[in-house]
Amino acid sequence: MTSTQRTLMVMAGGTGGHVFPGLAVAHRMQAQGWRVVWLGNPAGMEATLVPRHGIPMEYVHFGGLRGKGLATKFALPFNLLRACAQSLRALRRVKPDVVLGMGGYITFPAGLVTVLTGRPLVLHEQNSIAGLTNKVLAKLAKRVLVAFPGALPNAEWTGNPIRTELARTEPPQARYAARSGKLRLLVVGGSLGAAALNEVVPRALALLAPDERPQVVHQAGAKHIDTLKENYEAAGLSCGSDVALVPFIDDMASAYANADLVICRSGAMTVAEIAAVGVAALFVPFPHAVDDHQTTNAEFLAEQGAAVLVQQRDLSAELLADWLRGQSRDSLAAMAERSRSLAKPDATDEVARVCAAVAGANLEGKQ
């Protein structure tokens, strides 16, 4: 580190919804010559993922309380004190000019210590309903940023930081106008597979006449791909030119851009990516998400006619088939354009600029 180089510490962990937007900001700051160090849990996904991106890590041991047993709750004071001590040592080693909290359990003790030691804290809340940690820390932070308007009081609406390629796709009007023939459907189950989608979508497609049936790319996660294939075969649909079943999609920007319609869950990052690309979506929120935040995430687009929201309890093959029959490429294009109009494609730059400003620096240019 040079004597004039500034340092950002990113605190994030636990799930991709916290880690990936943090990585987007980290890379933006590195491109501006900043040193970036990550604070995470050695047992979290960040411990494996972040070092692959060339970002050094500091570790704090701290887990959540929600849904845990009495033993965990009784041990909370000790675990919190230990995590605060580990956070203090990490902050003293790294000496960050600004600390960015992107969520995850470790953000609570590390955020408290950041404020108590006089370092500037910037918070970013990815979901439409803020978690308890950010609700507390928002009262102490220098700047509070949100992906969805109204998620936290007196916060700045920046949107969710996303990968650069997602924000650079061709506008939906041009993409949809250039297509003809069958509709293109992308079903995204994620790494967990989204069993409800894997079961209902094949049966819904089987209810459509062959000339009504869209071309399908269905992603289901490696552990679920065999079951998914069985579901399609049971519905009388075989893999071929119109049905592609895949365990993973490397290039989500192209996958979204090539689709007329996406059927998927409504995690914060998924909603942000779909809006950034501008593609029609039918959201089926994960029913067991904390505070049912996936429903309110989806409502942000659905209430503006930029997506359709169907609760999992209401989803059936018959309902989905009937809805698909009523769609055209023009109707989906209109939905996609409304979605794009609600996007915050410069969110990564905005969050990075705030971090730089809090540290008394400027950020040059855009991604």
UniProtKB/Swiss-Prot annotation:
KW Ribonucleoprotein (keyword) present: no
Keyword Cell division part of the UniProt annotation: yes
UniProt keywords, alphabetically: Cell cycle, Cell division, Cell inner membrane, Cell membrane, Cell shape, Cell wall biogenesis/degradation, Glycosyltransferase, Membrane, Peptidoglycan synthesis, Transferase
Any one of the GO BP annotations: carbohydrate metabolic process
Reactions catalysed, as given in the entry: di-trans,octa-cis-undecaprenyl diphospho-N-acetyl-alpha-D-muramoyl-L-alanyl-D-glutamyl-meso-2,6-diaminopimeloyl-D-alanyl-D-alanine + UDP-N-acetyl-alpha-D-glucosamine = di-trans,octa-cis-undecaprenyl diphospho-[N-acetyl-alpha-D-glucosaminyl-(1->4)]-N-acetyl-alpha-D-muramoyl-L-alanyl-D-glutamyl-meso-2,6-diaminopimeloyl-D-alanyl-D-alanine + UDP + H(+)
EC number from the UniProt entry: 2.4.1.227
Membrane topology listed for this record: Peripheral membrane protein
Location of the protein in the cell: Cell inner membrane
Annotated binding of UDP-N-acetyl-alpha-D-glucosamine, by residue: T15, G16, G17, N127, R163, S191, I249, Q294
Chief localization: membrane
Pfam family, any one: Glyco_transf_28
GO MF terms held by the record: UDP-N-acetyl-D-glucosamine:N-acetylmuramoyl-L-alanyl-D-glutamyl-meso-2,6-diaminopimelyl-D-alanyl-D-alanine-diphosphoundecaprenol 4-beta-N-acetylglucosaminlytransferase activity; undecaprenyldiphospho-muramoylpentapeptide beta-N-acetylglucosaminyltransferase activity
GO CC aspect terms: plasma membrane
Origin superkingdom: Bacteria
NCBIfam families, per database record: murG
Role of this protein: Cell wall formation. Catalyzes the transfer of a GlcNAc subunit on undecaprenyl-pyrophosphoryl-MurNAc-pentapeptide (lipid intermediate I) to form undecaprenyl-pyrophosphoryl-MurNAc-(pentapeptide)GlcNAc (lipid intermediate II).
Protein name: UDP-N-acetylglucosamine--N-acetylmuramyl-(pentapeptide) pyrophosphoryl-undecaprenol N-acetylglucosamine transferase
UniProt organism field: Burkholderia pseudomallei (strain 1710b)
Gene: murG
